[in-house]
């Protein structure tokens, strides 16, 4: 069952335009952050219950779309050909007439939307309008004049307007009768003509990330926005939110088209091990490199989410390698700075309990098949996450306060594990 009232709703994607400003490649097949725009659209609609898709293209681009469907094993996608694309995008919609019955979703092939947009838009009806567009060029946007929640005028140059057309529609097959009426009057049918003639109902999704990709500049902008919206959020500590992510997202935007998440995880791991071994040469330099490795540690996850390549193995792999990095860094730090047996005991407790902080949340995932930070929100407010511990470690190491650092880590990490156990007992099993 999907959120459109339990109906089996299909998705229609218009991709029959030539998009001359972007060269010979169809705009929907342009890759942004490692994935085609169309792939993003299809997969996000699938997440929200849309199971079958019709892509309307033209004869020139048909082979390219056939290759796209085959390469991505999209068995739920059918291709329809508009042999007269010069008749307008309204006519392209009409080409889909024989493929849909009842309610269906209509989107443009060159539009991208954040995940939350899909969730809200699919609860609406008619044309989805944004009254607070933050990411589109208003001069180029199609504006909409609305009265009583229905479209009364639409176009780029209308004198007054209430919102912007997002290129996302929830329609039913009665729209084809409207197109047929217009075809009796003229040969070229634009979608705006259909919307205005039908006086489509309007639903609102305001202020969320969406945009259409018309120029190379739009591609660059879209890549950055996709990466910035791919930050994990839940489970991030204070340092990640206010320092690390501001740097890591910029790195991710540069790398997202060029490297896979798992390869980057390995590179980050090797850099982290290197930071630990640098303690044998320079403790201050090693501390700085350790903090840099913490920043890099967020990049693989951001790229995985931006490229739509998240996997259980990726998270599992990254978590294990993080433990090796932390163990190597703290062990080598202790090796070059500590001589007294009692402080080796304290350092051992610090190393073990630091690993247990991460293990406690990962073990929760294994036991309850859920994210501890989502099920027990109070955990988000407790300091001591990996990013916070690494940042504090850097500060103490730069100040030469190694023994106080190990004492702090031993007490801090142990206390956080105890609090985690208590909160899980209280909120989950209490």
UniProtKB/Swiss-Prot annotation:
| Segments crossing the lipid bilayer | 269-289, 341-361, 390-410
Q: Which residues bind CTP?
A: 14-16, 27, 119
A Gene Ontology cellular component where this protein is annotated is: membrane
Answer yes or no on keyword Cell wall biogenesis/degradation. Answer: no
From which domain of life does this come? Archaea
Enzyme nomenclature, EC number: 2.7.7.74, 2.7.8.34
Write down the InterPro entries for this protein, in alphabetical order. Answer: CDP-OH_P_trans, CDP-OH_PTrfase_TM_dom, CDP_ALCOHOL_P_TRANSF_CS, IPC_transferase/DIPP_synth, MobA-like_NTP_Trfase, Nucleotide-diphossugar_trans
Q: What main location does UniProt list? A: membrane
Short name of one Pfam family: NTP_transf_3
Q: What is its cofactor?
A: Mg(2+)
Q: Which reaction does it catalyse?
A: 1D-myo-inositol 3-phosphate + CTP + H(+) = CDP-1L-myo-inositol + diphosphate; CDP-1L-myo-inositol + 1D-myo-inositol 3-phosphate = bis(1L-myo-inositol) 3,1'-phosphate 1-phosphate + CMP + H(+)
**Membrane topology for this entry?**
Multi-pass membrane protein
> Which PANTHER family does the record match to this protein?
BIFUNCTIONAL IPC TRANSFERASE AND DIPP SYNTHASE, MOLYBDENUM COFACTOR GUANYLYLTRANSFERASE
Protein's job: Involved in biosynthesis of di-myo-inositol phosphate (DIP), a widespread organic solute in microorganisms adapted to hot environments. Catalyzes the condensation of CTP and L-myo-inositol-1-phosphate into CDP-L-myo-inositol, as well as the biosynthesis of di-myo-inositol-1,3'-phosphate-1'-phosphate (DIPP) from CDP-L-myo-inositol and L-myo-inositol-1-phosphate.
> Which protein is depicted?
Bifunctional IPC transferase and DIPP synthase
What is the scientific name of the source organism?
Pyrococcus furiosus (strain ATCC 43587 / DSM 3638 / JCM 8422 / Vc1)
């Amino acid at each position: 069952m999907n959120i459109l009232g339990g109906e089996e709703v299909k998705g229609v994607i218009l991709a029959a335009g030539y998009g001359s400003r972007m060269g010979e490649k169809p705009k929907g097949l342009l890759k942004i952050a490692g994935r085609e725009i169309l792939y993003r659209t299809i997969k996000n609609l699938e997440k929200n219950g849309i199971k079958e898709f019709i892509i309307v293209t033209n004869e020139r681009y048909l082979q390219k779309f056939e290759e796209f469907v085959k390469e991505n094993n999209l068995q739920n996608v059918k291709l329809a050909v508009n042999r007269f694309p010069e008749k307008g995008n309204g006519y392209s919609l009409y080409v889909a007439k024989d493929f849909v019955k009842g309610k269906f979703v209509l989107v443009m092939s060159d539009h991208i939307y954040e995940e939350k947009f899909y969730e809200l838009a699919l609860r609406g009806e008619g044309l989805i309008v944004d009254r607070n567009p933050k990411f589109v060029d208003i001069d180029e946007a199609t504006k909409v004049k609305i009265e009583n929640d229905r479209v009364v005028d639409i176009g780029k140059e209308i004198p007054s307007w209430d919102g912007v057309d997002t290129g996302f529609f929830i329609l039913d097959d009665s729209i084809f009768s409207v197109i047929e009426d217009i075809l009796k009057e003229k040969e070229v049918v634009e979608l705006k003509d259909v919307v205005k003639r039908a006086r489509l109902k309007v639903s609102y999704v305001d202020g969320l990330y969406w945009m259409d990709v018309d120029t190379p500049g739009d591609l660059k902008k879209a890549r950055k926005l996709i990466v910035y919206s791919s930050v994990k959020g839940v489970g991030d500590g204070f340092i990640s939110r206010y320092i690390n992510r501001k740097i890591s997202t910029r790195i991710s935007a540069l790398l997202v088209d060029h490297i896979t998440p798992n390869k980057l995880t390995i590179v980050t791991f090797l850099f982290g091990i290197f930071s630990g071994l640098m303690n044998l040469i320079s403790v201050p330099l090693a501390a700085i490199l350790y903090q840099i490795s913490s920043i890099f540690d967020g990049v693989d996850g951001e790229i995985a989410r931006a490229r739509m390549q998240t996997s259980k193995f990726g998270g599992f792999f990254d978590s294990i390698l993080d433990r090796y990095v932390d163990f190597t860094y703290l062990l080598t730090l202790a090796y070059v700075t500590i001589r007294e047996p009692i402080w080796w005991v304290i350092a051992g407790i610090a190393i073990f309990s630091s690993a247990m902080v991460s293990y406690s949340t990962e073990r929760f995932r294994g036991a309850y098949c859920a994210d501890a930070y989502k099920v027990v929100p109070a955990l988000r407010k407790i300091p001591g996450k990996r990013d916070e511990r690494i940042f504090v470690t850097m500060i103490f190491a730069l100040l030469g306060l190694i023994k106080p650092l190990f004492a702090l880590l031993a007490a801090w990490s142990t206390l956080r594990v105890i609090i985690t156990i208590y909160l899980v007992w209280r909120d989950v099993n209490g």
